[in-house]
Amino acid sequence: MNESVTVRGKDRYKSGVMEYKKMGYWEPDYEPKDTDVIALFRVTPQDGVDPIEASAAVAGESSTATWTVVWTDRLTAAEKYRAKCYRVDPVPNSPGQYFAYIAYDLDLFENGSIANLSASIIGNVFGFKPLKALRLEDMRLPVAYVKTFQGPATGIVVERERMDKFGRPLLGATVKPKLGLSGRNYGRVVYEALKGGLDFTKDDENINSQPFMHWRERFLYCMEAVNKAQAASGEIKGTYLNVTAGTMEEMYERAEFAKQLGSVIIMIDLVIGYTAIQSMAKWARKNDMILHLHRAGHSTYTRQRNHGVSFRVIAKWMRLAGVDHIHAGTVVGKLEGDPATTKGYYDICREDYNPANLEHGLFFDQHWASLNKLMPVASGGIHAGQMHQLLDLLGEDVVLQFGGGTIGHPMGIAAGATANRVALEAMILARNEGRDYVHEGPEILAKAAQTCTPLKAALDTWKNVSFNYESTDTPDYAPTPSVSV
């Protein structure tokens, strides 16, 4: 169906139930404006439901429609405010699923509010009965809307200047075990890891303020460790102090205490919610603090490819919201992420402009209107033996976090940190010399290990350990041959 079937005139407002595609939510001739917000949904209609009607229903229920005609539409600029589904395509290699392109007038959204944006785009419509499943795959956010957001509080360039670290990925580690350590022992882990050569250590997502370690105790021991490690190494160090708490008042209190102790970075979890994230981002910019976001909880709605929200959308929202770091996948680690999709996430974080790239899952051009860049973080199941792969796949502007790959080292935590630092420095040197470090990686590491016992022990311990499972979320596109004329 390529023509509009919208009912016009007085018949449009007759009382009763009308198909969404006839109410103006299906407009195949519509040309999206530069100022429109565009959403791409993967729609899976119930058996027997017309995909055009299902897609029009998504447009309607995520903008101005309800289940019946209401005469109060005539008191508004109804034709302007209706979301318009203008294109529906079958999803390649996925029978019964359709890509629905929907345009929303910018006036439908409050400036600078992820909460308001998401209330429409992923609100009630996700429970709509005529749909088996619904997934928000991607969005095009107009420059006029992007400019209403703060963007990353610090950004990659200023973070590197603040840390005085250039020309290589940053190195970190999550303290393990994530729960159960006393404050004193927690601080010992932080000191050993930083002294051994890491740039950062990190609280895990669920370490807040528990009976075995109060948050204030953790902050004090951690910052004592940071200061000692800085004095011992002559380098600037940091530890992500997780300020996540039950209320905003408590989070602000913890953040202020971290600032008083001289921390350069604090951390929050995605589960605190979009408004809380934006609030902490504003605090971080005001107080010259790097803000790390752990994406705890995201896989509950990002991992399944037919229902939920793609992580590429969450990455876009978090760049708008103003965090400086976000976990974005490792490819070779233990967590979900295929190479092409993960590359798309990293592009969203680090580029000023994202051209559409279906191979990477990017359906739209996206201009970031000079917002600061967001530093992606790779963590979960990575180790020194993968350094050449990580540098090749993820690039230079990334934090590589080796938690188990540092703290699980057979010679101890400091040795684990040293192994990772030496492996990285060896790989960066090889890259700068123009060597084919991707294919020569194992040889480069083996040579570096000849003069670094901790690296040799790491390579002997983890060898070729990798987590090679089929990804559940891969790009949907069908390559077609080009014809040269």
Curated annotation (Swiss-Prot):
Instruction: Tell me yes or no: is Protein biosynthesis among this UniProt entry's keywords.
Output: no
Record site feature (Transition state stabilizer), residues: 334
Question: Which BP terms from GO are recorded?
Answer: reductive pentose-phosphate cycle
Key word ATP-binding present in the record?
no
Needed cofactors: Mg(2+)
Identify the HAMAP family for this entry. Answer: RuBisCO_L_type1
How does this chain assemble? Heterohexadecamer of 8 large chains and 8 small chains.
Write the protein's name: Ribulose bisphosphate carboxylase large chain
Organism the protein comes from:
Rhodopseudomonas palustris (strain HaA2)
